[in-house]
């Protein structure tokens, strides 16, 4: 199973490099259902001026456009970075069952921040919380983030 996660995370890293090359934070995301990539997302909030163009949300939109709305609850979200609060809401709304990510984002992450949207059971309509696997290719994700911070004096 770890090899499978590594394969999809390598694809996310390639998407993150596309985001970085276009002036965006280096985030890439995939939605996978039954071994098939059903949605892809490249972070584009900065380049488009639309803050909702986070890689995870773009991947969900792409999966829906590809006809997979009813399968989202059975899909796995792969992403280079822990989903933020906004993306975590979308994940819970669509009941995506598993999330695999590289690096944590403790200030605004849906799993590690004090707002912990990904594990709350306080919203009954969200159902069961997703399984979360973190730290897959963390070092590579952190390097891309550092490259973005240096390029943008952050």
Residues of each region from the PLM?
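Generic structural signal for well-ordered alpha-helical scaffold segments
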Residues: 13-17, 60, 64-65
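A short, polar/charged loop-to-alpha-helix boundary motif
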Residues: 47-58
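Zinc-dependent deaminase
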Residues: 1-22, 83-154
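Short beta-strand scaffold segments in enzyme catalytic cores
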Residues: 27-35
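Helix-adjacent hinge/juxtasegments
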Residues: 53, 61-94
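Short, basic and Ser/Thr-rich N-terminal targeting/leader segments
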Residues: 23-27, 73
